[in-house]
Amino acid sequence: MRPLSDRLFPSKKIHSHSAAIINVCIQEVFMISLNINGKAYQVDVAPDVPLLWVIRERLKLTGTKFGCGIGLCGSCTVHIDGKAERSCQTPVGSAQGRKITTIEGIPENHPVKQAWIKKQVPQCGYCQPGQIMQAASLLAEDPHPSEAKVIEHMNGNLCRCGTYTKIKSAIRLASEGGNK
């Protein structure tokens, strides 16, 4: 395949240094098909753009938060094919054809959301969408996890307010069917 600069400017003779800069600065854009919260979307975007930015900026689903941008805090957690994934580290091209669920796609009557309300988990609330997504994926995988498994599974989701005790309590409540 010819360099992008040759395809953009076929009749121009471009110095090789300038051509290299053009090729680095201009990314090819593709039409990407996404299934988010059961709805089909088509976005024209470079395939290496993080899924987080497509979700927030292009599709205006702003429940998924930007925290660290390097996959360490968990604020950007979404479900991809039922598994918790960091959307800031997921290239949108790799999400094509997969089932994506954001916090907006989790029903209000979901046991985890209801437990979060009953246990009054949020303080500032910024990390809560990611915490809920991580907890929901845990309970989908293991409906009655041990405390050790809860701690292990939730370990990568950070909370500046330190509501970890309430988070664990809410997960326990959700795993018991919300009966406490």
Task: Show where each model-derived region lies.
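Short, Lys/Arg-enriched N-terminal segments with co-localized hydrophobic residues
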Residues: K13-F30
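Signature of N-terminal electron-transfer/Fe-S-associated modules in redox systems
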Residues: C25-K180
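Generic alpha-helix initiation/capping and coil-helix boundary signal
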Residues: K12-K13, Q128
